[in-house]
Amino acid sequence: MLKEKVEKLAEKVFEENNSLFLISLDINSANHIKIVLDGDEGVSVNDCIMVSRGIEHNLDREEEDFSLEVTSAGVSEPLSMPRQYKKNIGRRLQVKTENDKFEADLLSADQNEIKLSWKAREPKPVGKGKVTVQKEVVLPYTDIVEAKVKITF
């Protein structure tokens, strides 16, 4: 009951600010509500406050006591939705699939798959030594075990 009510309140807040979107909503047995959100242009503290107020002011503590935590998806968190991939086009990702693990630049993303590009050293077709080649792959989201944005300083 509480989860459905919180989901509806969150949807209403996200409709008012459509650059924000819900990543996860969890409610534990002690009625601790944890909302993780992300945004097309990132998430500010004011965005978290707005979402928190939009939910908290529409729930009755007299009816059911609760605690509320609203956070943004952290930089070290794996990407979990196509919309997160789209906002990170052009950035370097660390991608893990069932059989492989590699770093690549995110070239494009849609609702079903992503396109990645990276440079690899491979043996020359003729003679000794190696040559650098540009590789590209299209990966459906179903093949991705985990993908994180690589932070560079």
From Swiss-Prot:
Gene3D superfamilies in the cross-refs: RimP-like superfamily, N-terminal
Coiled coil ranges: none
GO CC annotations on file: cytoplasm
Protein localization: Cytoplasm
Pfam families in the cross-refs: RimP_N
GO BP, sorted A to Z: ribosomal small subunit biogenesis
Family: Belongs to the RimP family.
NCBIfam families (alphabetical): PRK02001.1
Task of the protein: Required for maturation of 30S ribosomal subunits.
Protein name: Ribosome maturation factor RimP
Organism: Christiangramia forsetii (strain DSM 17595 / CGMCC 1.15422 / KT0803)
Gene from which this protein is expressed: rimP
